[in-house]
């Protein structure tokens, strides 16, 4: 049986701290480029799960790059998004890896923001040259009708997360998600084992498919433990306008506060902690809070936020693989792929 390589194993080999190795592998924190490269090389050499099969370090990449599968006049991969993606969003790490992978195939990436008017009128961004576009990757495109319009273009298409798909016809495109259920249920289990009985959810479950899956995982978990009282104190205001205010107003109306909240993502969790503080509650002394994404802010927020880590590097590699194989074999059945996530326990749940 093959022994699983851990971050600690890599740290021991290099005589570095586990924290330093973790920063390099998860692309968080500040490290010297030479240190980061040394760690990643060792991780690949030892067969660490995230890098064991990835061509991270090719000598003379220009010479060893694979031949392009794209025609010379159609070499662009277009990224469409409705939001400005910050460096703390998991997509930042993911896109770095995605772009690195497609560059090996002599392809380039262009980024196009869908304006509110274009979204409403179901129009492509004016900056997009469809004649030069070999494929499209979508981030934060959660309007179902707009997504259907993109599918009708009959171009290779990948959604990273998607509109809520519950009770809707499937999109004619590949879809990539982070694993949303297992670690949410592990977080609820951790709370129950530590004596929490009234556990609620915070976040708009209809914002996107991932939020919906996280809510359903939470609900299944509390029903499994017979702790359904928390369902009545879920904080799920919809829409994005003045969300912190809406969240505050929602929990302000609660006659009984939960013992703990599971949140749709870290930014909902941080808004929730601030709202609870304004109402006189302390996290974690009075109420526990768990986020999702393991954003950079989670580790230096006060209190440090328990969260669920998304592996941006492996998502970027998987995204490139899905889109390029779709370009090469357009007749493939549509694929839905999930990548691993991990629960990270910190101060906001008493850890």
Language-model segments: which ranges?
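N-terminal helix-turn-helix DNA-binding module of bacterial transcription factors
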Residues: 1-65
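Hydrophobic alpha-helical segments within soluble ligand-binding/sensing domains
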Residues: 174-202, 241-249, 269, 310-328
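Short beta-strand elements in bilobed, periplasmic/extracellular small-molecule ligand-binding domains
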Residues: 102-115, 201, 219-244
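Amphipathic helical "hinge" segments at domain boundaries
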Residues: 48-124
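Flexible loop/hinge segments that line or gate small-molecule binding clefts
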Residues: 139-183, 267, 293-305
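Flexible loop/turn connectors
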Residues: 248-351
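Short, solvent-exposed amphipathic alpha-helices that sit
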Residues: 89-105, 183-186, 209-229, 271, ...
